[in-house]
Amino acid sequence: YEIPLRLVGSEMCIRDSSSPYILGSYLIGKEDRSILYTLAESSSMWEQRIAVVATLMLIRNGEFDDTIKLATQLLHTEYNLMQKAVGWMLREVGKRDQSLLIEYLDRYASSMPRTMLRYSIEKFPAEKRMHYLSLR
């Protein structure tokens, strides 16, 4: 999993496309996923983004806990690119378990950054999107 970490200074699309397959795949079946939380606590927005985007492979494997925990940990990030990444991963969780996403949004939508919220509800029907946007 050290390869995507070396890409921190490289193009965002390379990080986003490699993190799930390298770090995320590595973590499937592992109990110790502390590297995700270490990266999420980093002062580097790029390392934080690697942590969040790496969970895409876990999501595809039906494992949502780490994504939800990281989303909560990074809920108040001021970085627009992090808000987009967290919202994107929440949306991916919702594609597989909409009730979990709705439960999360019912709890946190009112305090989520607008960009994060918009990305997470992007695929919702208009009426449901408006409901969550009105909570802000």
Regions found by a protein language model. Give the residues of each.
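Short, structured loop/turn "capping" segments at alpha-beta junctions
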Residues: 14, 28-34, 46-50, 61-66, ...
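Long hydrophobic alpha-helical segments typical of transmembrane helices together
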Residues: 92-136
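Structural detector for internal amphipathic alpha-helices that build alpha-solenoid repeat scaffolds
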Residues: 15-27, 49-60, 85-93, 118-126
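Amphipathic alpha-helical scaffolding segments comprising HEAT/armadillo-like alpha-solenoid repeats
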Residues: 27-38, 63-73, 98-106, 131-135
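Single conserved hydrophobic/aromatic residue that forms the stacking wall/gate
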Residues: 1-9, 13
